[in-house]
């Protein structure tokens, strides 16, 4: 299996499976002399870690990261810094229950990658989905924590803005509220509603989808390049690599189709700090290049395919059968995808930041 690496100058290669010994990644292209410890990474991993509420999978993984390479104590200050060489990160798996999947090893789970992996490779790791499991995203979050260190002046934040058909009230958006509830929801009232709503979904053995919004503030104008290296193109592609993501939009996105030209175009005026925009329908990107406005990306996450309901399927021999998935699963996988979306945003921005320095010397 190839294509386990993303990025151009800031490159991330991930490895490992859901029920393997460990998962991990190698981050290549990180500049030297950046202070970096395991504690710098652990905070982001803890936000994504499973089993922290009844609304996520009850798999108990501590997700303790180990830095294997690419750092050393600065010879003068003693502070641990990056060396410019590949940074190896490892996260051990400690709470696998492969026996939960023994009954489905010959059946394809509807909505999962079982059928397509088997069609391509002739076999699949049925134990928790193997490489296709969202377990892999822990490594991206670890890489994203390093990317944030490359971009100290950029703040990347994410939130859940819709669950099922229920959207937040944007007039009540409060970033501080995101850390106060298990849904990463910026609307206090809607977070309380989601608690009751998702409890009902969870107890019925079903699942529900969500829409997440990732915002990067402090991004300088000029990142990205025309045509085939557009910043928004890379962001959309990065978000689409996240498990269960089925749609991505930048700025106004699909909503722009409902606007007139005068409504959609972000007008400009001269301000104290240079050019300022009167709106941000573009989501901080024009012509594939950042404008200096906040970069705004939203993506839709489908309902978790593993549900406690019988489903029609076929087996490896091509016979019709039924399947009911056991194991521990998220009733709304979109919840824990918020830190993953933040990580992918940070990695893409770090990549473009380094590429921009090489191209125009900023």
Curated annotation (Swiss-Prot):
Known catalytic reactions: 5-O-(1-carboxyvinyl)-3-phosphoshikimate = chorismate + phosphate
Describe how the cofactor binds: Reduced FMN (FMNH(2)).
Specify the enzyme's EC class, one word. Answer: lyase
Indicate which residues the UniProt annotation says bind NADP(+): 48, 54
Gene Ontology biological process: amino acid biosynthetic process; aromatic amino acid family biosynthetic process; chorismate biosynthetic process
Q: Which cofactor does it need?
A: FMNH2
Q: Please indicate if the UniProt record lists Lyase as a keyword.
A: yes
Q: Which PANTHER family match?
A: CHORISMATE SYNTHASE
Q: How does it assemble?
A: Homotetramer.
Query: What is the protein named?
Result: Chorismate synthase
Biological source species: Bradyrhizobium diazoefficiens (strain JCM 10833 / BCRC 13528 / IAM 13628 / NBRC 14792 / USDA 110)
């Amino acid at each position: 299996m190839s294509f386990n690496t993303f990025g151009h100058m800031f490159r991330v290669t991930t490895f490992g499976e859901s029920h393997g010994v460990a998962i991990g990644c190698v981050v290549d292209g990180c500049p030297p002399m950046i202070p970096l410890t395991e504690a710098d990474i652990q905070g982001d991993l803890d936000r994504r870690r499973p089993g922290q509420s009844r609304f996520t999978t009850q798999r108990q993984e501590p997700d303790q990261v180990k830095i294997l390479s690419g750092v050393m104590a600065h010879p003068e200050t003693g502070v641990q810094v990056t060396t410019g060489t590949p940074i190896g990160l490892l996260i051990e798996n400690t709470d696998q229950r492969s026996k939960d999947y023994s009954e489905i090893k010959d059946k394809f789970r509807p909505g999962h990658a079982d059928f397509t992996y088997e069609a391509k490779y002739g076999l699949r790791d049925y134990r928790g989905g193997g490489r296709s499991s969202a377990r892999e995203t822990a490594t991206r979050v670890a890489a994203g924590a390093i990317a944030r260190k490359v971009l100290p002046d950029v703040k990347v934040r994410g939130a859940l803005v819709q669950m099922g058909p229920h959207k937040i009230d944007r007039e009540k958006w409060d970033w501080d509220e995101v850390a106060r509830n298990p849904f990463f929801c910026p609307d206090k009232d809607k977070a309380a509603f989601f608690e009751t709503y998702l409890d009902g979904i969870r107890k019925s053995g079903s699942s529900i989808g969500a829409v997440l919004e990732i915002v990067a503030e402090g991004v300088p104008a000029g990142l990205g390049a025309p045509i085939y290296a557009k910043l928004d193109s890379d962001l959309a592609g990065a978000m689409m690599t996240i498990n269960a993501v089925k749609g991505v939009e930048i700025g106004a996105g699909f909503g722009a189709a409902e606007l007139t030209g005068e409504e959609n175009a972000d007008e400009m005026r001269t301000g104290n700090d240079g050019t300022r925009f009167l709106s941000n329908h573009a989501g901080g990107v024009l012509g594939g290049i950042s404008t200096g406005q906040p970069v705004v990306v939203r993506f839709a996450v489908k309902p978790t395919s593993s549900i406690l309901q019988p489903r029609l399927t076929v087996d490896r021999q091509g016979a019709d059968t039924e399947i009911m998935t056991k194991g521990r699963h998220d009733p709304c996988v979109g919840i824990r995808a918020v830190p993953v979306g933040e990580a992918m945003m940070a990695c893409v921005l770090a990549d473009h930041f380094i590429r921009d320095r090489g191209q125009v010397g900023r």
